[in-house]
């Protein structure tokens, strides 16, 4: 990503109230993008590069660690590097196959990572599966979801099969927002839409519908 793109990206993100993050792939990039980013993302392939993680952590900005291909020891080492600099990273469970086979997604590792790292844990998606994302959020409580977006299906990486198109991810976001509404408050009480129907229940005295007071009202 050319550095001269960042001022415009930063301004647009500010207008849309979106945080801007970026993945540095060389050490100098950490400082080059410092004034523009709200967080740094360490890609799975750079998770073993201590110097890069330490350079990002020294800025005190938020850090997201993607953990594709990594074992627990490698993940904890990266987390410890951040912690030593006073940063609590966000950890993303990930499968670094493009696209990720459903058989290898292993979403239950989100719980494992959360318990072992004591970090917020999310999911970095390469599956392009609505089911995977919904399960990551609502069964395994993923705190963050990362995905690859191709605007028109013409990008260089689209042919590998791990990128979402705008209409696809729009549907996922719609489902997530609806699910939040569907889950509700958890309080068991009559909903607003049920209030009128309550009048038509069987009366506790004679078992007939509607309630006696409703019968009296309707004659």
Role assignments for model-derived ranges:
Residues 1-219:
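Catalytic cores and adjacent flexible loops of soluble metabolic enzymes
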């Amino acid at each position: 990503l050319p550095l001269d793109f960042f001022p415009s990206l930063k301004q647009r993100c500010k207008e849309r109230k979106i945080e801007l993050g970026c993945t540095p792939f060389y050490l100098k990039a950490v400082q080059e993008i410092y004034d523009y980013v709200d967080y740094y993302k360490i890609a799975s392939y750079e998770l073993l590069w201590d110097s890069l993680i330490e350079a990002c952590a020294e800025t005190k900005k938020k850090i997201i660690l993607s953990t594709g291909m990594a074992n627990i020891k490698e993940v904890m080492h990266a987390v410890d590097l951040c912690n030593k600099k006073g940063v609590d990273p966000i950890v993303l469970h990930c499968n670094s196959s493009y696209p990720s086979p459903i058989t290898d997604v292993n979403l239950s590792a989100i719980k494992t990572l959360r318990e072992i790292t004591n970090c917020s844990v999310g999911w970095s998606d390469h599956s392009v599966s609505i089911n995977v994302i919904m399960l990551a959020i609502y069964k395994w409580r993923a705190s963050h979801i990362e995905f690859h977006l191709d605007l028109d299906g013409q990008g260089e990486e689209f042919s590998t099969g791990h990128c979402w198109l705008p209409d696809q991810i729009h549907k996922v976001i719609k489902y997530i927002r609806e699910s939040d509404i569907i889950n509700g408050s958890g309080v068991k009480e009559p909903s607003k839409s049920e209030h009128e129907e309550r009048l038509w229940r069987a009366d506790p005295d004679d078992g007939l519908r509607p309630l006696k007071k409703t019968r009296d009202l309707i004659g």
